[in-house]
Amino acid sequence: MLRVIELNFTDLEYAGFRAWPASDQREFDGFVLRSSNGFTKRANSANAIRPLISDLKGLVNRCEEYFFDQSLPSIFRIPSFIESESLDEYLEENFYEAKDHSLVLHRKIEASDFTPCKLAVKNATDWIASYSEISGINATSQKLHLDML
């Protein structure tokens, strides 16, 4: 029997946060602030999770202070499901630029879409070695990545 699970966009955001953890994660005023020593933008950004109704100047200043204290650039990640026109305008007026737009594709997956396969289960150290080999990077430079896993 096929089971349908209803998820809202905020639940999906939190699932994404759990899938790619950050060293530090805090919430306030509709944002999830995440940092991991600059390893990826997703794990080092202010992520809007609900419509923002508070003072934008104060909110952006608090986010900027958070990243400044960690010697990181301020990156705001604003999913398309967030009503953010005023935040977008405020950030643009303060010299932020929109970069690296994401596109999420989805489709219904039928049970017959899957073929049996074997999965290799690896510990984090072995996974980093495989990732580094595939990516053509030095595995010894991946300590932060390993710490996140």
Positions of predicted regions on the chain:
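N-terminal charged segments
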Residues: 1-69, 83, 140-142
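A general structural signal for short secondary-structure boundary/capping elements
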Residues: 93-95, 146-149
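A short helix-loop-beta-strand connector motif used in the catalytic cores of GNAT acetyltransferases and
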Residues: 18-24, 71-72, 99-102, 149
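Acyl-donor-binding surface of acyltransferase catalytic domains
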Residues: 52, 56-126, 139
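A broadly tuned preference for mixed-charge, low-complexity surface segments
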Residues: 21-29, 84-87, 123-135
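Short amphipathic alpha-helix that is part of the acyltransferase structural core
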Residues: 1-14, 48, 102, 109-148
